[in-house]
Amino acid sequence: MAHFDLPLDELRTWRSRSVEPEDFDVFWADTLAEARGHELGARYEPVETGLRTVEVYDVTFAGFGGHPVKGWLVVPAGARDPLPLVVEFVGYGGGRGLPHTHLLWASAGFAHFVMDTRGQGSGWAGGATADPVGSAPAYPGFLTRGIEDPHAYYYRRVFTDAVRAVEAARAHPLTDAARTAVTGVSQGGGITLAVGALVPDVVAIAPDVPFLCDFPRATTITDRVPYREVGHYLKTHRGSVERVAGTLAYFDGVHFAARGRAPALFSVALEDLTCPPSTVFAAFNAYAGPSKAIEVYDFNDHEGGGPFQEQVQLRWLAVLLTD
């Protein structure tokens, strides 16, 4: 697919038309207070993986509603002192997968926590976390589950799980809470933006080709799922356009970006039909942290920079978390 979105010079000034709810901050403060009414109950069970360079823990903690959420904690073998921590959120449809697929950050000397995504994990990497909450009728996928009520919306649970995942990761004695970064690709990047706003003391965030940004633009510019799930839903629920837009505004990465407090490293791919460039730049341009940078991959689709972006992230986080 050739370039289809705005020219790069216009992308650098693009601003979302998403309208921020007046009670955005109250909504999220109340949501997290409700979640913290449940004991975190983080449990770490050592796992024998056959890997010699890392040690792995199977983690369970209480997320939204006190529901059990899984994760992996991967640390360098033999680590005895608290390590800088990277918390990672995974892409749409995937789960935490198998431990041996998560070696990058521990190999660089970091503690690495990978959160499973509730109800997902059957698309491309296995998951182990159920979503026990039902919803009103939805289009197949996750993006429209509970979409007519922000309190019932699927991503309210996921974003809350993610905040609790940071708390669970920080509770382990081999992690240094004062040196915590969050990252993720696609859906994981959108979750990263939310956590960067909802956990004010993270040191850095690295959203990679982030999903869940600039919904008014995203749901009308691309035919590719997941965003297209919203259009398919509204084909049937014709009278729900305003209610759906109102719900999505509580979960738009643009509004979380406006509350960012940490240095941020974004990435964008100019041929990305899944997370169109203008939606990523909408979040980047709104980002309010003390510093920000964006890597632009001119001829890539949703794979983005892949290992090239990981290389950039490694150098960037080495400065922020270890110097």
What name fits each language-model region?
Residues 97, 103-104, 108-160:
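Cap/lid segment of the alpha/beta-hydrolase catalytic domain
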Residues 141-186:
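Gly/Ser-rich "nucleophile elbow"/oxyanion-hole loop immediately N-terminal to the catalytic nucleophile
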Residues 193-239, 296:
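Hydrolase active-site cap/lid region
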Residues 1-55:
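N-terminal targeting or regulatory segments adjacent to alpha/beta-hydrolase or S9 domains
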Residues 270-275, 303:
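Acidic catalytic loop of the alpha/beta-hydrolase fold
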Residues 281-323:
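C-terminal catalytic histidine-bearing segment of alpha/beta-hydrolase fold enzymes
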Residues 71-75, 81-93, 112:
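Short beta-strand element of the alpha/beta-hydrolase
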Residues 260, 266-268:
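Short beta-strand/loop motif that positions the catalytic acidic residue
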